[in-house]
């Protein structure tokens, strides 16, 4: 059957929304715990690729907590189940029939499926939905700094970070630390500014 839906509120960062549908007796897919997924576990991707309705493809979980810099999500489920144009918003389901992710993006130089698909895990989805219901927007933490990682690997890094030719290795030696985050910029009205963190501070731990 076909029913009309009305968007109540949406989160543009994750491209998720609350949609109200008038009707009753709707079957509901059980929501699984995406945190319990294991790499190599079988999953099914359901969607509408190329207007081929209710298409199901199968694959495995290729990786977890994959960061792409896309959609503001840094914890995608990566799968080789075919995800193409039109799959976005469809279900990623485990072998128990539980929803474990929302199909989101594919990674391909041509725009067609190349073996790399990504889904937003239910651990993020449930948080987004709860916040949209309660606040009408998603509550996100913002540290309020722009920084650079200081670690053992940068001791070999000779890339200049400013016009004077200073490198991260130079900075690490200057600070006398081998692990931490060097604060390069403070965002106005952010949490860091309110906590009196300054440019050139080095964050070495969190309470």
Residue ranges and their predicted role:
Residues 1-179, 184-189, 195, 206:
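Serine-dependent protease modules
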Residues 200:
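Conserved catalytic motifs of ABC-family nucleotide-binding domains
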Residues 203:
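Conserved "HGTGT" condensation-loop signature of ketosynthase/thiolase-family condensing enzymes
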